[in-house]
Structure formats: C-alpha cells, structure tokens
UniProtKB/Swiss-Prot annotation:
Record carries keyword Glycoprotein: no
Organism the protein comes from: Methanosarcina acetivorans (strain ATCC 35395 / DSM 2834 / JCM 12185 / C2A)
Name of this chain's protein: ORC1-type DNA replication protein 1
Role this protein plays: Involved in regulation of DNA replication.
Gene that this polypeptide is encoded by: cdc6-1
Binding residue positions for ATP: 70-74, 213, 225
C-alpha cells in the first residue's frame, strides 16, 4: 500500500530556499521602468502631440505602429503617466484611460469600462449600447477636462466592427466641457484598410512608427532590468548576450528578451541552481517557442487546423525527411473533412490557408519546379509534431480524427 505524502509545511520548505530573484515583476510586460532606454525620440514625439492637453486643448488623435516588443505600450503608458502627474501638479483635470482591446474586445465592453472608469454604474451586459455611450458622455462632460483614451491592440477591436471608433471619433461634437483624444496602438500596419474612411481620417491625424530594437539596444534593456530583477552574481556571463541574440532574431522583440531572461531564472531556481547559465537560456527559448506555438495553433480556425493536421499526418506516416506537396496535402485534407463532416474548401482556398500558416511560422512552404509537370509548393513543419498534434486534437471537432491515421489514412497510402 502506497503511503500518502504529508503536505504539512509544503510551501514553508519551498520558501526556506534562497531565491535568485530580487524582484521578478520587473521582467514582466506590465512593468514600466522610470527610464525607458532607446525610445527618447518616440517619447518626445508623443509628448509633443499630447502637450496641448495641458493647455486645455484637444490633442490630435494618434495611431502608433510597430512590431511586438518595440516599446509601443511602454512608451504610451510612460507618457500618459507623466501627463497625469504634470496636470495634477498644475491643478488641471487630465485623465488617461488605458484599454487592452485584446481583453475588452466589443463595443459594449469598451463603453462600459470607460463609463465605469468615471464612476458610472453600468452593468457589463444588458443595456442598449446607446444608453451606455450616453452615460459615458454625461460622466465626462460634468466638468472641464481632457481625456486621453489609449486603445492598445486596437486592431482586435475593429474585427467586430468600427462603430465604436466612429462614435468616439465624433464625441467632441456632443460635448460642452470635456475634450476627448484617442491613441490607437497596433502591431498591424494594415489594419486601417478595414476602417470606414471617415474613421481612418479622424483616427490617424498623427502617426508614429516604432522601429525594432537591435541586439545592442536589447542588451542594454536587459542589463537595466537584470540589476533590478536578480541578486548580485546570479547571472552567468553569456546569459544576457544570448537572450539579446535570440530576441534580435525575432525582429528585435524586447518583450521576448525579457521573457527569456525571466524564464531562464525560473528554470534555474526550480532546479535549485545558484546561477542562471547559458543552458537555462536555451531551454527557456525552447519552452517559450513551444508555448507560442501552442497558443497560435489553439486559436486557429477549424479549416486551418485541418490543413495543418493533414501536413502532420503526411509527415508522420513514413515520410520523415520528405517534404509534403500541396497536392498530397489537399488529398488528405479532403479525407479529413469527409471523416468529420466538414465542408471541403477549394484547393486554391486551402493553399491560401497554408500560406497563412507559413506567415505564422508554423510551416515553411517553398515553390519548386517539377519540370514539365509544372510548379508546386513543398511544405515542411516548423513546429514540434507531437506537441502540435496534441493541441489540435484538444479541439472537440477534431477529436474523431484520433483514429484516422490507422484507418482511412493507411488505406490511402498502402
């Protein structure tokens, strides 16, 4: 008989060990340091636009673009925080409201959050949207003030329509005392193509582009945070250069670099290692990449999942080392659709979905010539097969495909 382990003192034992971290939170994306390195130009540009709020005027609306981890959110929050501090010192009323549109992704939720920020009692569901908008306008127009609304990941919001942006962009015509300005932050340079031309014109009065960091700049950022995050002597000599090099390969993503530095330390600490070494960084890189792939695959549409599963089946059924052609992939895809009773898309549309997987870094597709047989695309996987397969089969619509590889598939390729 197995004796159950006592849980007495479980956390006390873990807390007894000395942590290699001084303050892990400074390595998280939510932390904004007092000094933002290598972003003076962007800070000054945004401050120049927003300074009119301190004169009681309406600042221009701003669109901020740049790839992930280029400091867009950090700069916007940093400048917003400073604006509020100066306005308070000068006894002015200036509010900066930050909204993450990946979380608050509907018109109703956005307006309800704005109204609640100004202490209006609005339920998170149930009211007509017009009523919520009216409550928000009444709340802010009670006094002379300037309000800056930061819409981070604004492209996530417009996927469900741009009505709310249209209404917010025209709100100043309905206000007597308050003035409202918007800052939209996005990783996607093309998202405005889907906007109503009137919204696009109003929202993009000013535009700021954030370039990627280079390896040296990322290294500076990591050194700054490492001093605050880790105890002295904990980091091995190659840890920061390696984190910076990995992140520079990922289009200069400082967020990725900070994640690497944090996860490397977590791996070392869980193994009771006194130092964070190069091997911990390499393992952290692998873990983060798997986590990224899992998240991307999990959120794919069903048809894209079927395309990906077709490629996985072909790669794992005696075709290791051989690339998959679009024709082979489409044949298997059709069988999968039949098997779970899903509509079959045209080969052209399926090829488009495969190209989207290529853009996401999940597969690698290369056009090759077959001589007189024409050209085709050869597809290889850029992600771990088993991890990806498990994530795909978590989808209840794909669960019936668990046994497909030993039934229909064997018949097709026997």
């Amino acid at each position: 008989m197995i004796k159950a382990q006592s849980l007495d003192g479980l956390f006390e034992k873990l807390l007894d060990g000395k942590s290699i971290f001084k303050n892990k939170e400074v390595l998280r994306p939510s932390y904004t340091p007092d000094l933002l390195l290598h972003r003076n130009e962007q800070i000054n540009s945004l401050a120049t636009i927003l300074v009119s709020a301190l004169r009681g005027e309406t600042p221009s609306n701003v669109l901020i673009y740049g790839k992930t981890g280029t400091g867009k959110t950090a700069v916007t929050r940093y400048v917003g925080k400073e604006l509020e501090r100066v306005s308070e010192d000068k006894s002015l009323f200036c509010s900066v409201v930050y909204i993450n549109c990946e979380v608050i992704d509907t018109q109703y939720r956005l307006l309800a959050n704005l109204a609640r920020h100004f202490e209006e009692e609005v339920p998170m569901t149930g009211w007509p949207t017009d009523q919520v908008f009216m409550k928000f306008k009444e709340a802010i127009d009670a006094r002379d003030q300037v309000i800056i609304i930061i819409l981070d990941e604004i492209d996530k919001l417009i996927k469900k329509g741009d009505d709310v942006l249209y209404n917010l962009s025209r709100i100043n015509t309905d206000l007597r005392k308050a003035k409202v300005s918007m800052i939209g932050v996005s990783n996607d340079l093309k998202f405005t193509e889907f906007l109503d031309p009137r919204v696009k014109s109003s929202l993009g009065e000013e535009e700021l582009i954030f370039p990627p960091y280079d390896a040296e700049q990322i290294s500076d950022i990591l050194k700054q945070r490492a001093k605050m995050a880790y105890n002295d002597g904990v980091l091995g000599e190659m840890v920061i250069p390696l984190c910076a090099a990995f992140a520079a390969q990922e289009h200069g993503d400082a967020r990725r670099a900070l994640d690497l530095l944090r996860v490397s330390g977590e791996i070392a600490e869980r193994e009771n290692q006194p130092q964070v070494l190069e091997e911990h960084v390499r393992r952290a890189q692998e873990k983060i990449e798997i986590d990224r792939v899992v998240e991307v695959v999990r959120t794919l549409p069903t048809q894209s999942k079927l395309v990906l599963y077709s490629i996985i089946l072909l790669r794992s059924r005696g075709r290791e080392g051989k690339n998959v052609t679009t024709g082979e992939m489409y044949n298997v895809y059709r069988q999968l659709c039949h098997h779970i009773d899903v509509d079959i898309l045209t080969q052209r549309r399926v090829t488009d979905l495969m190209s989207e997987l290529d853009m996401l870094g999940i597969v690698n597709a290369v056009v090759v010539s077959k001589g007189r047989y024409g050209r085709t695309k050869e597809i290889s996987l850029s992600v771990p097969v088993e991890n990806t397969r498990k994530v795909l089969l978590e989808d209840y619509r794909l669960k019936p495909l668990v046994d497909f590889k030993t039934a229909v598939f064997n018949k097709m390729f026997s």
